Amino acid sequence: MKVLVVGGGGREHALIRKIKESSKVDEIFCTPGNGGISYDAKCFDVSATDIDGVVDLAKKLSVDLVVAKFYRKKFLP
């Protein structure tokens, strides 16, 4: 499974470290990420608030799961 985590803070880093422990996960990507996250996931330079950019990146990478807080604001789990 390919996972994309959206954000660049401590919460996202902690999520990535736990996701990395799963045997079901093959690749982890993060956008925008940060220097610390880059040790655990491949980072891309797309702003977390650029929803169209994040969607395009997710499609380009053929991810199976996107983890992003901003969807909660739109009433999605």
Can you name each region flagged by the protein language model?
Residues 1-77:
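ATP-binding N-terminal substructure of ATP-dependent carboxylate-amine bond-forming enzymes
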